[in-house]
């Protein structure tokens, strides 16, 4: 307990770090196949310089989505444009992009700024230009203005990205989400830190620091709480922490393994792995009462539970077939069905939010990679070519996966699109990073 009192840094809960990216995203593959789009620098209508370049945030978001490729602004016409009223369709006749984002920023009181932006359908504008004069409003896909503070520039940039992404793809954007992960730095006495950051690595916050291992963070469906495993008391225990009130509750401290917590879709329960009755089995714990209900009962190891979106079944890893494979258990009937058969091992699975695909770690020829299986066709696609991949977590819109891997001998985070085309690494400056978890929509 003396070690805990000295090193467990609960006092630094949600202590915001400097405004820089803790995880520097390095894109490694997929930009050339992305859809071209134009994002113009937002017109500044004030003295000096704006607090931040919102267009840079939007461009970075769209690149990281793996879906879009912003064009170099130096090759674009009307570089001073700030609104639809200034748009000249004929000037854009030969620009090979499907849309253009334009906007403006102007002071609007003390530490207040009015941000306006328009999303223009460039393909429609080019087609209409061939037919003769027409109203520019016919090209307008979205137009908004909002008053924000200087501290909100980056967040509002993510909001614009969400709008643009959804308008052009029909899929909700996930740029205003967060990720949690564990940083391990053995040069420090409290080597383990549970961190939270924006999806792109900015606005990093420390939730907990400990000299003992921290692992398996999992978000609640409302994004208010985080469940995780801590060894701070020299044994595995599961905690749930409210990110706003800082209230921290010990949910499971049974003898043996207490691991792999994951919130139910209604946020009232945790699916966990416990070994209190012998072999590791799957249980569901009521968070309010802490009552644990046993779900599986087999002499082999059952672990890594995750919920189906309807909350009626669990996906889990089991060795009951001789090697680790993924199984589904119906919570009402208790019926267990094997889900994976390809490759040597399949483990660490989760179902995408739309319920159509399964994301998991596949081992084939001794290599561990992230894979996706279509649940209707049962077709499996290996998404990554990195080494020793683990702990995949799916974005709430189902388009991207963040996972742990090894690069140059260090544990780092990486991301891949669920179609496998876009890939990126997210290295951290100090230490190693593992156990990522993507938040729900916030």
Swiss-Prot record:
InterPro entries according to UniProt: 6-blade_b-propeller_TolB-like, PD40, Tol-Pal_TolB, TolB_N
Domain of life: Bacteria
Compartments where located: Periplasm
PANTHER family reported for this sequence: PROTEIN TOLB, PROTEIN TOLB HOMOLOG
The family this protein is said to belong to: Belongs to the TolB family.
Subunit-level organization: The Tol-Pal system is composed of five core proteins: the inner membrane proteins TolA, TolQ and TolR, the periplasmic protein TolB and the outer membrane protein Pal. They form a network linking the inner and outer membranes and the peptidoglycan layer.
Name of protein: Tol-Pal system protein TolB
Organism: Shewanella sp. (strain MR-4)
């Amino acid at each position: 307990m003396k070690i805990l009192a000295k090193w467990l840094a609960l006092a630094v809960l949600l202590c915001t770090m400097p405004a820089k990216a803790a995880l520097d995203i390095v894109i490694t593959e997929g930009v050339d196949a992305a859809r071209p789009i134009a994002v113009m620098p937002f017109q500044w209508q004030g003295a000096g310089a704006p607090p931040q370049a919102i267009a840079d945030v939007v461009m970075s978001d769209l690149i990281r989505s793996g879906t879009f490729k912003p064009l170099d602004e130096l090759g674009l016409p009307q570089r001073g444009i700030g609104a639809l009223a200034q748009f000249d369709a004929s000037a854009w006749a030969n620009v090979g992009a499907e849309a253009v984002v334009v906007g403006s920023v102007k002071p609007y009181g003390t530490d207040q700024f009015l941000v306006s932006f328009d999303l223009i359908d460039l393909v429609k504008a080019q087609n209409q230009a061939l037919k003769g004069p027409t109203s520019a409003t016919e090209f307008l896909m979205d137009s908004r203005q909002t008053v924000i503070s200087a501290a909100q520039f980056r967040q509002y940039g993510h909001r614009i990205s969400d709008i643009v992404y959804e308008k052009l793809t029909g899929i909700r954007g996930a740029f205003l989400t967060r990720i949690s992960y564990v940083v391990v730095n053995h040069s420090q006495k409290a080597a383990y830190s549970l961190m939270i950051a924006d999806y792109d690595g900015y606005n990093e916050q420390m939730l907990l620091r400990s000299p003992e291992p921290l692992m398996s963070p999992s978000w609640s469906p409302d994004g208010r709480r985080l469940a995780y495993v801590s060894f701070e008391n020299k044994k595995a225990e599961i905690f749930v922490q409210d990110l706003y009130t800082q209230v921290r509750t010990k949910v499971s401290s049974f003898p043996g393994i207490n691991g792999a917590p994951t919130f139910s879709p209604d946020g009232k329960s945790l699916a966990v792995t416990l070994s209190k009755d012998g072999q590791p089995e799957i249980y569901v714990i009521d968070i309010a009462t802490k009552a644990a209900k046993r779900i599986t009962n087999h002499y082999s190891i059952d672990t890594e539970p995750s919920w189906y979106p309807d909350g009626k079944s669990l996906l889990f890893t089991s060795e009951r077939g001789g090697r680790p494979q993924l199984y589904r258990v119906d919570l009402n009937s208790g019926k267990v069905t094997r889900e994976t058969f390809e490759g040597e091992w399949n483990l660490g699975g989760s179902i995408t939010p739309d319920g159509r695909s399964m994301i998991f770690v596949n081992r084939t020829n001794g290599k561990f990679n992230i894979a996706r299986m279509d649940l209707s066709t049962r077709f499996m696609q290996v998404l990554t070519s990195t080494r020793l991949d683990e702990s995949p977590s799916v974005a709430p819109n189902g388009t991207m996966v963040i996972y742990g891997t090894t690069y140059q001998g260090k544990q780092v985070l990486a991301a891949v699109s669920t179609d496998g085309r876009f890939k990126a690494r997210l290295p951290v400056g100090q230490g190693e990073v593992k156990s990522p978890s993507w938040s729900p929509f916030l």
